[in-house]
Amino acid sequence: VGGVGEVDVHVGHVDAVVLVDDGQALVSGAGANGITLADAQQAAQRSNMRYDRDGDSHYDILSALQKSVRGSDPDAALHYLARLLEAGDMISAARRMLVIASEDIGLAYPQCAAIVKACVDSAFQLGLPEARIPLAEAIILMATAPKSNSAINGIDAAIADIRAGRAGDIPAHLKDTHYGGAKKLGRGLTYQYPHMYPNHWVQQEYLPEELRGAQYYEYGPNKTEQAAKSYWEKIKGPQ
């Protein structure tokens, strides 16, 4: 058999085995009747799903999974999840699902990340085949949930400023004051403790002087973020 060396099969004394290129036994049937055509076809089909995890097919399926969830298509998302599971790649599927929960659902449904994490944990405790159930639950939840990418957009905008050299000194009133001599250095002298004020908020500057007025976070149009925006507009004024 190509790729696995010599294989000595004595019909009637060993189980029938179908070997694939990676030398892994995919189909075995007890008895002396040999391998049927159906056995070989099934083994070949499953072998084709065992893609190179460092190759294009691996990333294509993960990409299609995330884009299907992002596009709110639960049927397509289930299809690509099934392809990953049938290829034996539950780990990559689970990792990508954790990313999707924060990147694509995000603040539109903040509880989603915790639910997906719980489903992923359950999947690893159960193992396949039962693991498919909580993973499917998580995929359907994300595909049918409201979407927001405001978190990834916000952090990427902040990182872009840092990488461009726009950082600046931390305002003195925000610096650590737990050590002796901190106040002599002017640290924390004018800090206002928000919990001492109505609605637990007081106007003060938090960004470095060089970034004064920078806005990284933009409220998404979903119900959850708009509720937060409305709440703070009543307290701070229009954002």
Show the residue positions of the predicted features.
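Short linear motifs in low-complexity or flexible loops
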Residues: G3, A16-V18
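Terminal-proximal interaction/regulatory segments of ATP-powered molecular machines
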Residues: G71-D75, L81-H195, N199, P208-E209, ...
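Conserved alpha/beta core segments of nucleic-acid transaction machinery
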Residues: Q42-Y51, E103, T144
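C-terminal helical "lid" of AAA+/P-loop NTPase domains
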Residues: D22-G29, A38-Q45, S63-K67, L78-R83, ...
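Inter-lobe coupling/hinge segments of SF2-like helicase ATPases
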Residues: N33-A38, R46-Y59, D73
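Short linear segments in intrinsically disordered or otherwise low-structure-confidence regions
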Residues: V9-V11, V18-V20
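Conserved AAA+ ATPase small/helical "lid" subdomain
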Residues: G12, G23-V27, G31, L135
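Alpha-helix N-cap/N′ positions at the starts of helices
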Residues: S57-I61, A76, A114
